[in-house]
UniProtKB/Swiss-Prot annotation:
Annotated localization: Secreted
Additional free-text comment from the UniProt record: Was identified as a high-confidence drug target.
Lineage: Bacteria, Bacillati, Actinomycetota, Actinomycetes, Mycobacteriales
InterPro entries in the cross-refs: AB_hydrolase_fold, Esterase-like, Mycobacterial_A85_antigen
Cellular component terms per the entry's GO annotation: extracellular region; membrane; peptidoglycan-based cell wall
GO MF annotations, alphabetized: acyltransferase activity, transferring groups other than amino-acyl groups; diacylglycerol O-acyltransferase activity; trehalose O-mycolyltransferase activity; zymogen binding
Known function: The antigen 85 proteins (FbpA, FbpB, FbpC) are responsible for the high affinity of mycobacteria to fibronectin, a large adhesive glycoprotein, which facilitates the attachment of M.tuberculosis to murine alveolar macrophages (AMs). They also help to maintain the integrity of the cell wall by catalyzing the transfer of mycolic acids to cell wall arabinogalactan and through the synthesis of alpha,alpha-trehalose dimycolate (TDM, cord factor).
The protein, known as: Diacylglycerol acyltransferase/mycolyltransferase Ag85C
Documented activity regulation: Inhibited by 6-azido-6-deoxy-alpha,alpha-trehalose (ADT).
Species this protein is from: Mycobacterium tuberculosis (strain ATCC 25618 / H37Rv)
Residue stretches in coiled coil: none
Listed EC numbers: 2.3.1.122, 2.3.1.20
Residues at which substrate binds: 86-87, 170, 198, 276-279, 283, 306-308
Alphabetized Pfam families for the sequence: Esterase
């Protein structure tokens, strides 16, 4: 029996179990997947080739009481914010560790911004420091990304606080859409790659909490409170689709189906996580269209696992679209309409 057949059988069996046992069973599988996919050792060096004009900035954050490291490549007044995954490190952003993103966007007319850190943060403003791992300050990533960093970059690097793109993967896929939903002038463009797009639904709060606890011992209740707290829906892209439609935000949503291609990612955790995530992405697409959304690209190919080569492929694919939206460049040849 294949791993996916075992998972399907487990999910079917879980429907007959008491809720607590069912959550524990599925949670164990999800945490296994997250550990396998994101649990690698710290990387000593980043991918950027020598010669690129990449700067390592220290941007003050009054809300978090510390300076935040930001990797920055200047390229124009409008920027692409590249947000990291669940196991974000404190040395380099995962986009730089795992992809040639700086090189791919060099001389594109766009600046590239990679905030560093934020493990298990969901790039949101938390209620309090994590109560399970001794964190001595409160994550305030939304405040940093929408107020503190834009003001500093405008004053010091000439980057506009408006007209930018937010691109996130996995943990931060939904974060990118939420930033655009609430800050439409700053982010007229948002992309989610293999994101968790309905975090307030069903088992997702519990599963997310288990994953966060595994990734650094973080407590989801310290982030958004119990699952009944309004913060879960406030930060749920599915719930906030009407905002994205009303804003006419340009969105790019990608998710594979768990089948590897020649790009790699042929391992059980990466395949399982992508298959688990696909359903909410498809539901997001359908709900967006039903709510009148007509400014989205939805890519659900017959392959793709929860791994960096697929996300980088999408980052390259969306470059012309981002340039068109942010800089008014020639639009890509293929029309971008909600997929059927």
């Amino acid at each position: 029996m294949t791993f996916f057949e075992q998972v399907r059988r487990l999910r079917s069996a879980a429907t007959t179990l008491p809720r607590r046992l069912a959550i524990a069973a599925m949670g164990a599988v999800l945490v296994y997947g997250l550990v396998g996919t994101f649990g690698g050792p710290a990387t000593a060096g980043a991918f950027s080739r020598p010669g690129l004009p990449v700067e390592y900035l220290q941007v003050p954050s009054a809300s978090m009481g510390r300076d935040i490291k930001v990797q920055f490549q200047g390229g124009g007044p409008h920027a692409v914010y590249l947000l990291d995954g669940l196991r974000a490190q404190d040395d380099y952003n995962g986009w730089d560790i795992n992809t040639p993103a700086f090189e791919e966007y060099y001389q594109s007319g766009l600046s590239v911004i990679m905030p560093v850190g934020g493990q298990s943060s969901f790039y949101t403003d938390w209620y309090q420091p994590s109560q399970s791992n001794g964190q001595n300050y409160t994550y305030k990533w939304e405040t940093f990304l929408t107020r503190e960093m834009p003001a500093w970059l405008q004053a010091n690097k000439g980057v506009s606080p408006t007209g930018n793109a937010a691109v996130g993967l996995s943990m931060s896929g939904g974060s990118a859409l939420i930033l655009a939903a609430y800050y439409p002038q700053q982010f007229p463009y948002a992309a989610s790659l293999s994101g968790f797009l309905n975090p307030s639904e069903g088992w997702w709060p519990t599963l997310i909490g288990l994953a966060m606890n595994d990734s650094g011992g973080y407590n989801a209740n310290s982030m958004w409170g119990p699952s009944s707290d309004p913060a879960w829906k406030r930060n749920d892209p599915m719930v906030q689709i009407p905002r994205l439609v009303a804003n006419n935000t340009r969105i790019w949503v990608y998710c594979g189906n768990g089948t590897p291609s020649d790009l790699g990612g042929d391992n059980i955790p990466a395949k399982f996580l992508e298959g688990l995530t696909l359903r909410t992405n498809q539901t997001f697409r359908d709900t967006y269209a039903a709510d009148g959304g007509r400014n989205g690209v939805f890519n659900f190919p017959p392959n793709g696992t929860h791994s960096w080569p697929y996300w980088n492929e999408q980052l390259v694919a969306m470059k012309a679209d981002i340039q068109h939206v942010l800089n008014g460049a020639t639009p890509p040849a293929a029309p971008a309409a909600p997929a059927a």
